[in-house]
Amino acid sequence: YVTYEKLTINQRCLENFDESVIYDNMLCSSEGKEQCINCHSYQNYNPDKMQFHARQQNGGTIIAMDGKVRKINMKHDSLLSAGVYPAWHPHLNLIAYSTNHTMQNFHTRDKNKVEVFDTDSDVILFDTENNTVMPVSRLKDEMESFPSWSPDGKWLYYCSAKIEFSDSIGKEYDANTRYKDIKYSIYRKAFNEKDMTFGEAELIWDAAANNKSATLPRISPCGNYLVYAQGAYGCFHVWHNDADLYIMDLRTMESKP
């Protein structure tokens, strides 16, 4: 479970399956000063524009654009964290990120042995040319996460869970005992490229009203279909045995497994 220290980001040639290493996690790791890399993402499958996160030792977000590589740190007092889950705009030099306070538990009796959950999260937009950050959604008593653009770049989809944690006992403790009450639904906001503004939040799938939790929205290349993961609760469905993939026809708003 803790072998993340040996992670590498590789690329494979589809013509002959030759592999080469883009980045080796052990290059900057040493005993007691480990590094963790992941969340690599490209702009519309373009290898000339890539980003990945490096955490812990020498942490930051590595952005490679048009042959130039740089490390940035978006952590600021006004943000919950540095950027976490990324989503490149299809053709503009913009990356939507969630910022998250994340925890995890290990269970012995529950059939889902690992539980990863947030106690707070927002969605932001990072301008890679001007190094500026603007909020997209940071509502009180809501946790927004997993941004994803439509193929035309006119909509930003994301998940949001409405829940109010107790301040008297602390968010971490309350979330730890009520993690099965955290249920995400899928929203989207219209994006205006000319003035870089977002519209009001539009509810696309009210999973919470159906006692479910929907995460990781992805839009088909034609723009007509939404694929998402859905389970009984929470945001990290990779650990949930009951979770499955669903598809929604955005023209009829009907969903099916």
Where are these regions (language model features)?
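A short loop-to-beta-strand structural motif that recurs across blades of beta-propeller domains
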Residues: T8-N10, G60-I62, D122-I124, S185-Y187, ...
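Residue-level detector of Asp-centered blade-edge/turn motifs that repeat once per structural unit
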Residues: N44-N46, P90-H91, P151-D152, P221-C222
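Hydrophobic beta-strand positions that form the internal "hydrophobic ladder"
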Residues: K49-M50, I95, G153-L156, L226
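Multi-bladed beta-propeller domains
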Residues: L14-Q35, A64-A82, I124-M143, K189-S213, ...
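Conserved beta-strand position repeated across blades of beta-propeller domains
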Residues: S41-Q43, A87, S148, R218
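Short, conserved, GDST-rich strand-edge loop motifs in beta-rich repeat architectures
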Residues: Y1-T3, Y97-D118, C159-I182, A229-D242
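Beta-rich catalytic cores
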Residues: C36-N38, A82-V84, T119, M143-S145, ...
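Loop/turn-rich, solvent-exposed surfaces of beta-rich toroidal or solenoidal domains
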Residues: N211-I247
